[in-house]
Amino acid sequence: MTQDSQIDSLLPPLRLNRRGFIATAVATGFTAATGHAAAPTAIRTPADGLDAGEVRIPAEGGEMPAYRAAPQGKTGLPTVLVINEIFGVHEYIQDLCRRLAREGYLAVAPEVFARQGDPARYTDIATLRAEVVDKAPDAQVLGDLDAAAKWAAGNGGAAGRLAATGFCWGGRIAWLYAAHNPELKAAAAWYGQLRGKPDALRPVYPIDLVNDLRAPVLGLYGSADAGIPVADVEAMRKAQAQGSSAARASAIEIYQDAPHGFHADYRPSYREEAARDGWRRMLAWFADRGV
């Protein structure tokens, strides 16, 4: 199984760079390469009433940029770490942070590819993957999420109320993080890869970790996903039933006829009904677990 078919539906038409301006080069390059145009369904969540923007987070090797959004002037907030697709913390990911902030969360999306490069500079998928995404070790990414969680706890987040959600590439990481951080209370993985060929940088996949899960995960998948067969999802369900207590408490929802990237409202892959239902389920999943 390759990730190319998964990624095709997620190509972003535009991105806000780290200073908040529109980076049109990536949009032009990706659109030219794929023939896709921006979907009119793209959601734009306003930042009024929120503290939203770039922050710098102490991490291994220096500072890591991140986007954060929270209700303005509030503290003691439940925290959600938002884990990006291969395109970094572009406008869609930032908008998800603002949506979560409007639900009362401190949402933090760390730039976990900052050491490898800026995804906004790339105009073709193969080069982006080879030079940035595939060079980011799981261990580094999980450490960066730990750094983001620590930063959040000292900047308005409530201790003991931590969740994570990830999309596509980040969906796989969300599963891994649920096995990594004992302080995580819940996670939601949107169409994250469940099986794959291990290598030095990616030694395990979610299906390998069912005995190690420390937090229950809500998996959100589509039956028409070209890169993640329903057979893989069903295999994960079966493995969970024999895994740790957190694995047995996890759940997977499969949306009929939904493709990969069905939550990506800026792409033709967007399926509003499935996206809205998945978001509702995610919020309830977090709330039911004290986040």
Q: Which residues are covered by each model-predicted region?
A:
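N-terminal secretory signal peptides
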Residues: 1-16
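Gly/Ser-rich "nucleophile elbow"/oxyanion-hole loop immediately N-terminal to the catalytic nucleophile
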Residues: 123-165
